[in-house]
């Protein structure tokens, strides 16, 4: 599948058109952001980790009967996906309160949000 022009770019990934209108290449970048995207730096391997984690989650959902957009992993940082209307949802997992959630919920920065587990 040939990757063509850039369709859209977010904080962590880019979507590219392909020769098939129903499919896109999702490219996970090594970009990291802080301060609501105002500070961008590169972290080598981040795109690979995010691509593999995304594929793990999507394959798990699919195994439980939840259809998803993932078609195949193309390489370390790219996957072939179906072109769909996005359902905007974000999940950030931390073991402590940080970032914009502290402002929204009035939480103390650094407050433990769950007990440690081994």
Question: Model-predicted segments: where are they?
Answer:
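Active-site loop/lid in soluble adenylation, ligation, and acyl-transfer enzymes
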Residues: 2-115
